[in-house]
């Protein structure tokens, strides 16, 4: 009986410690990112940048090709808050997705929590996160849409969360539009500024390769 009672005390103590640690870790990750890393990021993570992305519609991969789709993003830092910047994605569509999406969201730089530090190893990492961005565009039937229809173009529940290394220029983030089950994933990659000059040609090649892939696999 004493053994059972002692075991229960140990379990209770462990649970208390676990939740206390998680709470403390969550408080830490809400803190500002290192100022030097942020300042270093501003000179590179700025303006138009082409990244490879995956897009899903209702959980179905519309990108299909393993290398992803070349996608142009715009990064603009706030002149009011040194820890904030806005990520914009304009006129985004993939193959016969039919839908054209525009999205922008202000994100805040943060430190990584202990779990994230184990996944994103090495110096230079900052986390960025933002919610309730603006989304507008054209649906598959050609009709336009503007956010949730009740609050301008703001989509409550939409979000961006990602990670950037100010030293290696690696980046990874996910855009959740919270509309029609559409998501964009920028998988872990190193930014190459030279891709901007070849964007149109690369996008055309992607579309041609996508059409060939669909024909080969009998995808309509």
State what each model feature region is.
Residues 23-116, 120-125, 182-220:
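Acidic/polar, low-complexity intrinsically disordered N-terminal segments immediately downstream
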Residues 18-21:
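C-terminal motif of bacterial Sec signal peptides marking the signal peptidase cleavage site
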Residues 122-220:
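Beta-sheet ligand-binding and adhesion/scaffold domains
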Residues 8-16:
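Hydrophobic alpha-helical targeting segments used for export or membrane insertion
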Residues 1-8:
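Bacterial N-terminal signal peptides that target proteins for export
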């Amino acid at each position: 009986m004493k053994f059972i009672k002692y075991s229960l005390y140990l379990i209770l103590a462990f649970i208390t410690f676990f939740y206390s640690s998680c709470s403390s870790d969550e408080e830490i990750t809400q803190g500002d990112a290192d100022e030097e890393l942020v300042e270093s990021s501003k000179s590179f993570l700025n303006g138009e940048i082409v990244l490879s992305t995956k897009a899903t519609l209702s959980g179905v991969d519309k990108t299909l090709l393993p290398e992803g789709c070349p996608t142009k993003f715009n990064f603009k830092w706030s002149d009011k808050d040194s820890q904030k910047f806005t990520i914009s994605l304009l006129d985004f569509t993939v193959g016969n997705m039919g839908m054209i999406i525009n999205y922008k969201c202000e994100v805040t730089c943060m430190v990584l929590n202990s779990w994230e530090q184990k996944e994103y190893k090495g110096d230079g990492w900052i986390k960025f996160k933002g919610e309730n961005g603006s989304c507008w565009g054209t649906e598959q039937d050609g009709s336009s849409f503007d956010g949730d229809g009740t609050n301008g173009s703001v989509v409550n529940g939409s979000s961006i969360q990602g990670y950037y290394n100010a030293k290696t220029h690696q980046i990874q983030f996910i855009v959740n539009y919270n509309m029609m089950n559409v998501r964009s994933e920028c998988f872990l990659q190193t930014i190459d500024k030279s891709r901007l000059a070849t964007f149109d040609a690369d996008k055309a090649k992607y579309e041609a390769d996508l059409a060939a892939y669909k024909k080969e696999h009998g995808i309509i």
